[in-house]
Amino acid sequence: NTKPAGFKLPMYGLIKRIFDKAYSKADQLLSLGRDMEDVLVRKVENVEKIKERQPRFTIIENWADIETIKPQPVPEGKIILEYAGNIGRVQGLDKVMDMLPEEVELHLYGTGAMEEKLKARKQKNVFFHGPYFRSQQNEVLAACDIALVTLQEGMYGLGVPSKTYNILASGRPVLFLGPKNSEIDLLVRENGIGYCDWPKKWDKAELAEMGRRARDLAEKEYSERIILEKFLKVI
């Protein structure tokens, strides 16, 4: 887990072996996605002399707040791509701004270490809205055609952006920029609820249809009740 942070000293290899052995002694290992489970399986397989006893692996995803967050009408006018969260160094928002087509607006909600640097670019189709309260989440998520989710390359299996599931609840598709075959990459591609690379063409009608599929998926697969039932089955 230390590779994405750039740690290469021998002591971190020792720490990794200690943690891998601890994982191997568990009866049950829960993960948030398929990529995370893949990493856990390989960690356990690396530990010697445990072939007679393997932990059970179960995936339990984050849930979508489908009761509080409801689909709202899509804004008229230009296509709006929205990012809500930490405006930090590892989110890659500078690269997003580089790739942003002129006909698409990028709206940023939140604050962070890169905020002032990005503002200084004075890009005409990029707008900064600052932080927001959790009580405003429904309103914020509805203020776009498609929502941006990023995950740093090298973070495969080490994190699943939980914001994704409330985006689905809001009835908005996802533009995911991150490791291939990570959980959100698979989720988006398998269900047709967005893009995992910059689309060649932006179409409001297509985005709206993807958004309807996203909400339907949230209700059928990721409600609080469904996810809590998964926990009950392993307790």
Short names for language-model regions:
Residues Q91, F133-A142, A147-L168, P173-L186:
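Nucleotide-sugar-dependent
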Residues P75-Q91, V96-P101, H107:
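Conserved donor-binding/catalytic core segment of Leloir-type glycosyltransferases
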Residues E105-G110, E115-N138:
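Nucleotide-activated donor-binding/catalytic signature segment of Leloir-type glycosyltransferases, i.e.
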Residues K51-Q54, I66-I80:
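Nucleotide-sugar donor-binding and catalytic loop/hinge architecture
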Residues W198-I235:
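A charged, aromatic-enriched C-terminal amphipathic alpha-helix characteristic of glycosyltransferases
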Residues D35, I60-W63:
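Carbohydrate-associated surface elements
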Residues L9-L29:
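Membrane-proximal helix-turn-helix segments that form the acceptor-binding/catalytic region
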